[in-house]
UniProtKB/Swiss-Prot annotation:
Gene3D superfamilies: Phosphate transport system protein phou homolog 2, domain 2. It is found in: Cell inner membrane. Keywords: Cell inner membrane, Cell membrane, Membrane, Phosphate transport, Transmembrane, Transmembrane helix, Transport. Its main location: membrane. One of its GO terms (biological process) is sodium-dependent phosphate transport. GO terms for molecular function: sodium:phosphate symporter activity. This is Putative inorganic phosphate export protein YjbB. Belongs to the YjbB family. Might be involved in phosphate export. The chain crosses the membrane at residues 1-21, 76-96, 99-119, 134-154, 175-195, 196-216, 238-258, 274-294.
Amino acid sequence: MLTLLHLLSAVALLVWGTHIVRTGVMRVFGARLRTVLSRSVEKKPLAFCAGIGVTALVQSSNATTLLVTSFVAQDLVALTPALVIVLGADVGTALMARILTFDLSWLSPLLIFIGVIFFLGRKQSRAGQLGRVGIGLGLILLALELIVQAVTPITQANGVQVIFASLTGDIMLDALIGAMFAIISYSSLAAVLLTATLTAAGIISFPVALCLVIGANLGSGLLAMLNNSAANAAARRVALGSLLFKLIGSLVILPFVHPLANLMDELSLPKSELVIYFHVFYNLVRCLAMVPFAELMARFCKRIIRDEPELDTHLKPKHLDVSALDTPTLALANAAREVLRIGDAMEQMMEGLKKVMHGEPREEKALRKLADDVNVLYTAIKLYLARMPKDELAAEESRRWAEIIEMALNLEQASDIIERMGSEIADKSLAARRAFSEEGLKELDALYDQLLSNLQLAMSVFFSGDVTSARRLRRSKHRFRILNRRYSHAHVDRLHQQNVQSIETSSLHLGLLGDMKRLNSLFCSVAYSVLEQPDQDEERGEY
């Protein structure tokens, strides 16, 4: 039992090492890798090579598939080139399996030692993340060595020998067991290595080993399908296409396993080495043969998985790519783009508010819907940012993280205020057949125009971080407050003059002035984040 636990822990260490390498590479080169993938879609050979290269870096075809599916889900990459990239990823992971199974036991402690020094010394820097990659590679090599050590006593047990001795006849059953190995270990590499070790120990025959390798490849396709089961239709098509390619390859090669085994037996190499080489060349030949059929497979997948009908009319997040969370700069940029979409919705709310002020009560319903849309986007941004490893962010990234969440919160609060303003105008003015005085409506329009201008400038400052624009926004905030105070006094003067319309709408009018003042403060608060003024808190607190 203890030996089995050692094997399971070694497999877990292999998966964890792969995760650490992927995380480190994505944080250092994530944006560049995405650029490579997105720009390699014009020609199939480029897409194929991009899949190989990216997978070699991130140590996982599943990670590359996740990146590609996120692109397809956002309509950044078409399905056909995405399938070609995934085929390249399968070749890349097979090549890395060959490299990692060389005798590199001396390299493991060196990589871990140097990696820890860099990672702990400069954790949030580029060098620190490269140290993380070194730790991950060292753990992978250590895990591979531990797997070999753990399997050896297991293979000597009589019960295990009896179980594996039964794997001699049914090639389909052998392939399914290989797929099960890959799913249980969450890694086709671990399954292939286990197969090679069992072959070297003489526990399983060489033909059975080839079937297990073929099944392990199929299992990795099933894993990708399971990982994307909750994704949208576009992302599921990529996973389905990858699985079908592997299924077709398995069905084609399985009948020829015994002739291939007899042919490879003539090579003067250890059986364990032959298993690894078969894994490499099988994936290489299969993927190269499938590339010309990528477009046909894309059409088939679109027929099988159709676009889902849009039942929910609410605005939905478009840029919150989960696979970008390992690349903080990219994830923050995605969240910022989503905040800009909230800004667009806020502009629509401002336009609707003006229509309500001018006697169009139907717009009040549209304001409620837009407020719900803003809340949906704000919640999505908040949850997305909460999934980022905030403790590992660099100082600048941490500041930007706080800036994004604060801006999203301010806009969400502003949307609630605008929704309430529209409702109060409809209830107190339009329903009661009361109208603002001509002078009062002009003043509200002037404040509205200034407020809309400040909102647009605030979104520009938020996205660009331009100091000059931030200073201009701060000045605009002060001008708005002066104008708001002047119009409040003007309204009181009209009350002294016994203006009937002003008297009837007085509480509503003054309430709108106060709400606009609060909106202005919420919009303009981003200026202080950029300028980092010492009197920031004092200025923000004044409404």
